Amino acid sequence: EDIPQNAVVLMKRFRKPEFRTLGEQVKDQLCREFYNQIVGERLNDFIQEEDALFLSAQAGVHDIVRHYEGQNIAITPLPGMEKEAVRQVLEQLERIHRYAITDQKLKELTDNYRLGLKQSAAMLRRMPNSVYLKVYQDHFLLGYPLAEVAEKLDAAWHLLDSIDSRAVHAWLDRWNAGDLNRIYAVLGNNPDYPFPDSESLTRLLREARQSSPAPYVQAVADTLPSLMDFTPVAGRIVKTKRLKGPGAEEWTLSNGAKVYYKHNDYESGAFNLLAGSPGGRSLLPAEDLPSADALNTLFLQYGLYKYPARLLNAIMRGHNIDINIDLGERSESISCSSTRDDAEIAFQFFHLTVV
């Protein structure tokens, strides 16, 4: 039986302070980015580890128009559990605000952010046009100070040490108090469905602020396990062929797979891996298409191998690895990008994803 996809959305609009310097704007943006990341991780943890009364929940702060930004809370509740689901999410947000924004967590996030800044700085002369376009869009549409990409990267690098729990809580206090400029939206196909009204949602917001949520308990062990605790069966290259046109090599592996390898100096010390095969959605029966549509969204949300998401995140902390999957109409693929220093764990991650 299909689960009705009703949804409840709570929105709040608020005015953004005037930024007189690039540093003020970048610091505000960093606080917002780290806050959104903490909220997303904690809500995902709650869905995986607790008796959640909702199928999904997203919450975060985003730009709206010039001088304004807003908080969006979108909840897909279990059927008939709209009020209970909203109460759960709002109480979890209150718990996050009180206990999840810590110096330790922000140190983890800022360390990972530095890795991204190093990557961006390495390709500064090869930035795509879309990056420069966004600089002008942010200036003219959002009122951000106009600055070169290098200036933004440098400002972010030097401001990361100032992003601690006090800074993020100060940013949070700027907009979180009060209920002005709130909008509620309920979505569903049945006009007779008993959705919660605005009075009920406002009451739930106020009750959540007055609640007494429990602090978080650190469940991850002090000594983290290795990502891969076994040695996979080794393959071998049985044939090598030089491809003159693209200046690459074609390797045939012992399992019949073809590998195309090309070295370049586009980003020194970085590598990209793409694996694909024909097939895709076109080979799936109709009843499996809804699950296929959710594949990209749910990828790694519940962990990998024998590790739940929270432990997996702890194991991968500090490693600069990006893995994505794509299920097209007639093909499927998985891509991995990383650096020389993280090559071994990147290939372990890739192996566990595909086997």
Regions found by a protein language model. Name each.
Residues 107-244, 248-252:
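C-terminal regions of mature proteins
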Residues 34, 38-39, 74:
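Noncatalytic, helix-rich "gating/capping" subdomain that lines the substrate-entry/channel surface
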Residues 245, 266-267:
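A short acidic/small-residue loop/turn micro-motif
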Residues 1, 192-197, 335-337:
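Short, solvent-exposed polar/charged micro-motifs at secondary-structure junctions
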Residues 28, 32-36, 243-247:
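Long, His/Glu/Asp-enriched segments that create or flank divalent metal/ion-associated functional microenvironments
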